[in-house]
């Protein structure tokens, strides 16, 4: 898994994997979550300094290897505020 793909909640309530570039083109009101820990994420466009489009957790989580801003604990676990 990478931070270049997230999941969006579809109209029927199921979760679908989409690339971050595709997610950027969807309504911002759609819920987006991490495919690993299911924590809520926001998507970021590519920047002029070369950083690719990616997602970041709304709230960092040590139990997710994709969470930026905190060191991964080495043990995967669901986000404390996971979206079902």
UniProtKB/Swiss-Prot annotation:
It comes from the Bacteria. This is Uncharacterized protein AZC_3924. It comes from Azorhizobium caulinodans (strain ATCC 43989 / DSM 5975 / JCM 20966 / LMG 6465 / NBRC 14845 / NCIMB 13405 / ORS 571).
